[in-house]
From Swiss-Prot:
Negative regulator of sigma-B activity. Dephosphorylates RsbS. Plays a role both in maintaining low sigma-B activity during growth and in reestablishing prestress sigma-B activity after induction. Could have a negative feedback role by indirectly communicating sigma-B protein levels. InterPro entries: PPM-type-like_dom_sf, PPM-type_phosphatase-like_dom, Ptase_RsbX. GO terms for molecular function: L-phosphoserine phosphatase activity; phosphoprotein phosphatase activity. GO terms for biological process: response to heat. Residues 11-198 form the PPM-type phosphatase domain. The gene is rsbX. This is Phosphoserine phosphatase RsbX. It catalyses: O-phospho-L-serine + H2O = L-serine + phosphate; O-phospho-D-serine + H2O = D-serine + phosphate.
Amino acid sequence: MIQVEENEHIQTLVYQLNKEGKSICGDSFFMKADDKELICAVADGLGSGSLANESSAAIKDLVENYASEDVESIIERCNQAMKNKRGATASILKINFEQRQFTYCSVGNVRFILHSPSGESFYPLPISGYLSGKPQKYKTHTATYEKGSKFIIHTDGLNVPDIRSHLKKGQSVEEISNSLKMYTTSRKDDLTYILGQLS
């Protein structure tokens, strides 16, 4: 499944594949952009199939319902919602177009990389663990971005040796997605990524 959206501030592309043999994807995502900001989230439910989807879909719904709150408040809501569920790893990204600023928070192995036209990359080390309803520490990153910056948020179903080179070379989100196709064929795990290019 591929979903493409754009406005004057951003172009985005979402790509998702189920694990081979599974009818339900254990990953979920949410993305919404208006003329002021983007909020997006990717969640990877532990395991695969319907129980994994139950956890990741709960995170997607919470991000959608509480999108106006700050990133750390949203991720804490997501953590609390994982009580009596299998649990999930998750990343949440908010981008303020007017201030050219982004805020990012994650727990677990959903990765985020932002590459700037000047050659700098922002690649926060993930906090180990997963959202489970138990007390959890979070690390929130806030930084500014350059016009033309490109980013990807992806679950561990996408395993690319040097993903920054794809962000660097690709002229558009579609071109970057095409360059990643060769890494989406194994289907050993659910796979989800969100690509973005900031104007």
